From Swiss-Prot:
UniProt name for this protein: 2-succinyl-5-enolpyruvyl-6-hydroxy-3-cyclohexene-1-carboxylate synthase
Protein's organism: Chlorobium phaeovibrioides (strain DSM 265 / 1930) (Prosthecochloris vibrioformis (strain DSM 265))
Description of how the protein assembles with itself and partners: Homodimer.
Family to which the UniProt record says this protein belongs: Belongs to the TPP enzyme family. MenD subfamily.
Keywords on record: Magnesium, Manganese, Menaquinone biosynthesis, Metal-binding, Thiamine pyrophosphate, Transferase
Gene: menD
Keyword Signal: no
Record's function text: Catalyzes the thiamine diphosphate-dependent decarboxylation of 2-oxoglutarate and the subsequent addition of the resulting succinic semialdehyde-thiamine pyrophosphate anion to isochorismate to yield 2-succinyl-5-enolpyruvyl-6-hydroxy-3-cyclohexene-1-carboxylate (SEPHCHC).
Biological or metabolic pathway of the protein: Quinol/quinone metabolism; 1,4-dihydroxy-2-naphthoate biosynthesis; 1,4-dihydroxy-2-naphthoate from chorismate: step 2/7; Quinol/quinone metabolism; menaquinone biosynthesis
Cofactor: Mg(2+); Mn(2+); thiamine diphosphate
Biological process annotations from GO: menaquinone biosynthetic process
Co-factor: note: Binds 1 thiamine pyrophosphate per subunit.
InterPro entries: CHASE_dom, DHS-like_NAD/FAD-binding_dom, MenaQ_synth_MenD, MenD_middle, THDP-binding, Thiamin_PyroP_enz_TPP-bd_dom, TPP_enzyme_TPP-bd
CDD domains with a match to the protein in the record: TPP_PYR_MenD, TPP_SHCHC_synthase
Catalytic activity: isochorismate + 2-oxoglutarate + H(+) = 5-enolpyruvoyl-6-hydroxy-2-succinyl-cyclohex-3-ene-1-carboxylate + CO2
């Protein structure tokens, strides 16, 4: 067996085992050193793949795809800076515990750290952001192929086991790279005969749900049963079963449930949008729970965190399904690592009688809904608030939603309409909360689900990932991209630094003065720019009923946006004061 044949077999075995382990979608960036891997993927009938000239975009697409499917998409690249471009997506996947597998091709031993072209130190390049990383050997008949299978299987297992996250396998190859088949029997391949003729993976790994321990549950049930005023918080969660169980628990106990946008519950007709009450300082002063039970990860709004610092509840219990720490304010009194669903189920029935807050809460949210509707009346200029409200009203059940960080996700978290019988599947990048790679992640999310998607994105995040617009028309499904163009970093206008005129505009707002129209034309996308809420509603309905992808650009003023947000929050604060009888 010559070297090309050896490399071909080696790469084919790797790709086949990845597919059998469930990692069957590959994000490939063109390159010479990775030729054996690309050829093996292209020639495997069970593989699905997409080509990416930009590795950075590929990394975020893989992230979105894994968010949708629950399985790692495999990133394949050549040597050099190609692999370094994955780092932002790897950081997000690590922080948000999303499975990911990087398969980077590399130079062999004799070409490393000697001045050879396109060669960097790739092994360990992602540092602490991987769950596992391994320098694979150069293909050799002296290495049993069973060890290669076992290593691939372990890599996928490490990506999927708690805590989920990225795995990096660095594979050196020697030239030549072109595939060459081997027709003669090889003793080296004989131990793999059963594997080659079957369809099962070499190793089957289980990922069981972790049950909460009995002592912790006994304590938590007792605290919940005896609490004067409990509060349940549903934070970032990627599992629909977890979300449903938390909602059912709150209904069973008849206590308030603060459901963050990332919890999967925000749009549900059975959930009250407590964000609108928590924004009121008067409400936060009056509502003082003595027990807070926090399921899942972080929250978008800072108001619950501010409230916790103010309340200092007797007990703050955090339930998360991974071993990572979640205690941003260092006030957790009970920490449970277990399945969110199983923990929520185990808490049911430990309390009787509805919270005194529930009746006035329903009155408040009815009035708040009317106030938001008035602020987004059809003839008013379209704004970030109106955009979020209308999108949440119009999205059909078969559509996905992806929200960019900064203002889009906050506007939706605060003002979304509740009333969906089947909550919209919503994606965000809240692991590290960056604005990079948003279009790429949304495209991967849509492709992974195989459903049309609506993306809300700000102008700076749009520019940051502009080249990813080239992906949209190659997807199986259309995307409605809502570009909130306030000519700069709108979120900074809410911060104290905005009062310093001499430094704010050029150094924080950073206006870019561009339109999305030329970008739509360049990448073959439809385009519209509505001016009023009524026009935006019509544009969105038209886009939702089309099989073409569209950019809907909403041009708005940063200063006017701040005024609208603050005016509406003030009116909601007055309603909260009246509804909850705050003196």
């Amino acid at each position: 067996m010559n070297n090309p044949q050896l490399t071909t077999v080696w790469s084919s075995v790797m790709v086949e085992e990845l597919i059998r382990q469930g990692a069957s979608f590959f994000c490939i960036s063109p390159g010479s050193r990775s030729t054996p891997l690309t050829a093996a993927i292209a020639r495997n009938p069970e593989a699905s793949w997409k080509m990416f000239p930009d590795e950075r975009s590929a990394g975020f697409f893989a992230l979105g795809h894994a968010r949708a499917t629950g399985f790692p998409a495999v990133l394949v690249c050549t040597s050099g800076t190609a692999v370094a471009n994955y780092l932002p997506a790897v950081v997000e996947a690590s922080n948000d515990r999303i499975p990911m597998l990087i398969l980077s091709a590399d130079r062999p031993f004799e070409l490393r750290e000697c001045g050879a072209n396109q060669t960097i130190r790739q092994n360990g390049i992602f540092g602490t952001f991987t769950r596992w990383q391994m320098e694979l050997p150069e293909p050799s008949t002296s290495i049993p192929l069973q060890s290669l299978l076992s290593t691939i299987a372990h890599g996928v297992e490490k990506s999927l086991n708690s805590p989920r996250g990225p795995v990096h396998l660095n594979q050196p190859f020697r030239e030549p790279f072109e595939p060459e088949s081997c027709s003669t029997p090889e003793p080296w391949l004989e131990p793999l005969q059963a594997w080659q003729t079957g369809r099962r993976p070499s190793t089957v790994a289980a990922q069981p749900e972790k049950h909460p321990d009995m002592d912790s549950m006994r304590t938590l049930r007792e605290l919940t049963g005896n609490a004067r005023q409990p509060l349940i918080i549903a934070g970032n969660s990627t599992d629909e079963n977890d979300s449903h169980a938390i909602a059912e628990l709150a209904d069973d106990l008849q206590v308030p449930l603060y459901a963050d946008m990332t919890s999967g519950l925000r749009f549900s007709s059975s959930i009250l949008p407590w964000q609108q009450a928590f924004a009121s300082p008067e409400f936060r002063n009056a509502f003082r729970p003595d027990l807070v039970i926090h399921f899942g990860g972080g929250l978008i709004s800072r108001h619950p965190s501010d409230a916790l610092k103010q309340w200092k509840p007797d007990h703050l219990a955090v339930i998360r399904n991974h071993p990572g720490r979640y205690s941003p304010d260092h006030s957790v009194t009970l920490s449970i690592e277990a399945s969110l669903r199983l923990t929520a189920d185990a808490l049911r029935g430990c309390r009787t009688g509805a919270s005194a807050l529930m009746a006035p809460a329903k009155r408040f949210f009815t009035e708040a809904d009317r106030e938001i509707a008035a602020a987004t009346a059809p003839d008013l200029p379209v704004s970030e608030i109106g955009t979020a409200r209308i999108v949440s009203e119009l999205l059909p059940p078969d559509h996905l939603l992806f929200l960019s960080n900064s203002m889009p996700v906050r506007a939706m978290d605060s003002y979304a309409h509740t009333g969906k019988e089947n909550p919209i599947k919503t994606g965000t990048n809240r692991g590290a909360s960056g604005i990079d790679g948003i279009i790429s992640t949304a495209a991967g999310f849509a492709e992974g689900h195989g459903q049309p998607l609506c993306l809300m994105i700000g102008d700076l995040a749009f520019l940051h990932d502009l080249n990813a617009l080239s992906l949209i028309n190659s997807l199986r499904v259309p995307i409605q991209l809502i570009l909130l163009n306030n000519n700069g970093g709108g979120i900074f206008s809410f911060l104290p630094v905005s009062e310093f005129d001499d430094i704010f505009e050029p150094n924080f707002a950073t206006p870019q003065n561009f339109s999305g129209r030329p970008a739509a034309a360049m990448f073959g996308l439809d385009y519209t720019a509505p001016l009023t809420n009524s026009e935006f509603r019509e544009s969105l309905l038209s886009a939702l009923n089309s099989n073409r992808s569209t950019i809907i650009e909403v041009v708005c003023s940063r200063s006017e946006n701040v005024r609208l947000h603050r005016a509406l929050q003030a009116r909601l604060g007055l309603l909260a004061t009246e509804a909850f009888f705050i003196p």
